[in-house]
Amino acid sequence: MSLDGSQASDFTLDSTAGEEVTLSETLDDGPTVVLVNRGHWCSFCAEQLQTFSEVAYDLWFHDNVDILPVVTDPVGKLTEMRDRYDLDIQLLADPDGSVADQYSGTEQTSHGLTGIAATYVIDTDGTVRYEQVADHPADRTQGNFVRYFIRNDFANPFGDG
């Protein structure tokens, strides 16, 4: 089921910054990017998060965009991941997968319950303006694409097709 064009589900999760983060509160300032990631062990997740870490300050400073990576792991594992990959963004803990379920869904893997990798760009009114759910764990939207998408009034650089 696609969420593109629909209202995003609100959520509040604990972050690696030691605070709770609520989606609706970030939307008060500007668009928000929600990334659903599989776990601290996922190299594809780390690669994607690094691309968003590289553009996060630029998006926040120039466009008031927040990046919210939701990962189906406890905060302790996410803190290790953040430090290991030198990420400049906070990670949000969704250990029971309840938020991932509202977005891209979850699946049982050899690592336990994991979120299905996905990227969402949510406008200030809560509307999902972009959705990409991975067909394969390596299938990811990168930070530069999202920056282009937001700065060009949510226009897909590859056209509508």
Predicted regions: what they are:
Residues 1-161:
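Chalcogenol-based redox active-site neighborhoods
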